[in-house]
Amino acid sequence: MGVPLWYKDIFPQGEFDGFYRKLGNHAVNYIERDPNQLVITFDNLAEAGGRHYARDAWATKFIGDNGWSHLGIFAGGPTWFRDQRLIDYLSNLKAEGLFRHYANVALAGTSMGAFGALAFAHLAPGSTVVAFSPQTTLNQSIAPWDRRFWKGMKQDWSLPYSDVTQHLDQVGKIYAVYDPYIEQDRMHIERIQHPNLVPLKAIGLGHKSAMVLRRMDQLKLIMSGAIKGTLTQSEFYQRNRDRKNVLVYRRNIEEYLTERGKEHRVPRFRRAFKLRRAAREA
């Protein structure tokens, strides 16, 4: 049986200081590496509730490979981090000065994890958020148009930080990657009013934008630039050009056309896709 990467770093003979804290249906682990850069990541639905023992927080290996310090937030299910114990614990970390210790703090996640990154970013004033296909809330009195995640909707949305748009004034910069063809994702981004919002339209990538970028071997480069605060929209769109050769892109666009009564355009689009891929492989 293997052990998680974070444990190898902070077990008694490990190279770094750190901790692991279990909090009911959540857990937090911390690895202290680079004194200048802390990255805080949040589970998404793919990882949340995983029962295997060798479980790492989202992007653990990527962050370790870059030598950055890491605070990883685990979820035991589709909780959307609506848990008073977790909220209090992260607030206490702020009060103890953990986030203030670092010159640069970035928070990152995808879907549910992106909500977490946006919801808690204000605990580290001046921080950067890297959010892939985020929700801003699942409170149905605020966002009745997003009913995709019924287990998330059942969480306690009366808890603090349940509408991220109310807590962004101290955040430094927000990179938001989303597919504008996914109506709910687009509407969540439209709710974010921030002077340093960098909207990154990932047309055809669908809700699982981070997964598709990983298949394109672009996710690490995009995340690295965003965490450092150097990523530009033009660079993102340049790196996203190869999406037109990814099968998920083709299927997402075909679904989009069909849903809008334009299925007559699907055969032509599919032929163009196949010709483009054949030309690349020739």
Region roles according to the model:
Residues 1-103, 126-282:
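Extended, composition-driven regions rather than compact fold-specific motifs
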Residues 109-119:
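Glycine-rich nucleophile elbow surrounding the catalytic serine of serine-hydrolase chemistry
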Residues 122-124:
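Alpha-helix C-terminal capping segments
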